[in-house]
């Protein structure tokens, strides 16, 4: 009887080669933190060490959960079946809808850098668990002729935050497993020496970094969470952070992280995950904060816009809602989709909230100071924002918020118009 075998390269094909880039990968990890009931998600980029650290204060993982869920491909990580228990929840918080369902988050890490150290501590369980530590070198999964079962992923448990000596011991286990593959001639000498050099150069001390970085992510005394230490980080992260110095457009990181939650529309839900990104450009402890909430649209600015369109499209594509012109005249509108013939739409019903700012100051009711500020933000961040359960949905796995090219069309054809658009509470089926 024959059976399917899975080459290790399948993970590379499903992960790194399917993710649009580092910002998209980070977005997937934030969604995983959301699903783990985290309140905070911090990103620290230490340029001098070429190290990216991502930390959340969520529920974390036990050793069994890490091995049976995180290291298992497919949707079982988020869904229950007869042979596995439901993912843990934090009963002290409102239940959160699951954002990630296909295991993309764990594979997306390979799009950020070639090696990752995972440190996780489970909390709110029936008993106190030790800290779980694992190390993965993604270069191994690029090698031809190796099956998944040939690759060893060392998983250790510690009662303390692991230090440099602990990590060196884990790295040596990986090198020894590669040496065995080399002796079996499953990998050649050149690949073995190359990957061995990469593993040896991985210099991370989680204990020391926990003291050095911003506090609030302790993994002792009943606290929990998951932390990723990724190094080396791919060079594209620099352009993702800095963008084009000659352009006013938002950088790729800003595009991805600004507006992750809906904070624009009145009465929006309170964001459940507070996201921070610190860029340490020197070795003196100083950093640049990449995410400044004041740089994005505020509720007050959204309401200042000249015109508003708010309502709902039903399952047949009919729009029903309010239209407010220059903040004064309000009209009830019903717009039928004449050519639909009572067929239900594929996306289902959804709500829309659109704010429109006149492209010229003389045509706007907004004062000079506010107009200049809102228009500058519109030029940088304006576009279509789609939210499901108050978390932005990204088209085609990319960070482009203007994927319908609304702003581009407007700039090319009608220079006197600019848009500030927010799409919220989209119920996609």
Located regions from the model:
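N-terminal assembly/transducer modules of large multi-domain enzymes
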Residues: 34, 142-429
């Amino acid at each position: 009887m024959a059976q399917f075998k899975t080459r290790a390269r399948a993970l590379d094909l499903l992960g790194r080669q399917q993710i649009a880039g580092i910002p998209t990968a980070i977005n997937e990890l934030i969604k995983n933190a959301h699903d783990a009931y985290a309140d905070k998600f911090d990103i620290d980029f230490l340029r001098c060490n070429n190290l990216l650290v991502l930390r959340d204060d969520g529920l974390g993982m036990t050793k069994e959960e890490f091995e049976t869920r995180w290291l298992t491909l497919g949707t079982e990580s988020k869904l229950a079946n007869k042979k596995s228990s439901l993912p843990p929840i934090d009963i002290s918080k409102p239940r959160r809808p699951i954002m990630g369902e296909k295991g993309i988050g764990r594979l997306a890490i390979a799009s950020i850098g070639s090696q990752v150290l995972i440190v996780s501590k489970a909390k709110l369980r029936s008993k106190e668990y030790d800290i779980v530590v694992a190390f993965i070198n993604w270069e191994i999964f690029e090698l031809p002729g190796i099956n998944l079962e040939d690759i060893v992923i060392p998983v250790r448990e510690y009662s303390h935050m692991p230090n440099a000596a602990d990590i060196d011991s884990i790295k040596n286990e990986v090198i020894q497993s590669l040496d065995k593959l080399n002796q079996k001639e499953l990998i050649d000498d050149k690949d073995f020496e190359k990957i061995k050099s990469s593993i040896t150069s991985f210099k991370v001390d989680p204990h020391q970094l926990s003291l050095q970085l911003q506090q609030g992510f302790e993994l002792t005394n009943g606290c929990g969470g998951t932390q990723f230490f990724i190094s080396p980080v791919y060079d594209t992260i620099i352009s993702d952070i800095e963008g084009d110095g000659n352009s006013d457009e938002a950088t790729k990181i800003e595009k991805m992280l600004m507006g992750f939650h809906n904070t624009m529309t009145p009465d929006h839900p309170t964001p459940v995950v507070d996201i921070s990104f610190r860029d340490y450009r020197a070795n003196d402890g100083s950093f640049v904060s990449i995410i400044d909430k004041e740089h994005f649209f505020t509720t007050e600015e959204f309401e200042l816009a000249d015109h508003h369109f708010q309502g709902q499209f039903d399952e047949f594509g009919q729009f029903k809602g309010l239209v407010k012109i220059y903040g004064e005249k309000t009209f009830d509108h019903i717009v039928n989709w004449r050519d639909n013939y009572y067929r239900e739409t594929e996306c289902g019903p959804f709500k829309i909230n659109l704010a429109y700012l006149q492209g010229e100051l003389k045509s706007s009711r907004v004062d000079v100071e506010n107009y200049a500020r809102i228009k500058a933000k519109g030029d940088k961040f304006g576009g279509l924002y789609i939210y499901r359960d108050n978390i932005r949905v990204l088209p085609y796995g990319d960070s482009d918020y203007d994927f319908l090219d609304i702003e581009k069309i407007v700039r090319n054809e009608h220079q006197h118009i600019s848009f500030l658009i927010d799409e919220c509470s989209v119920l996609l089926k």
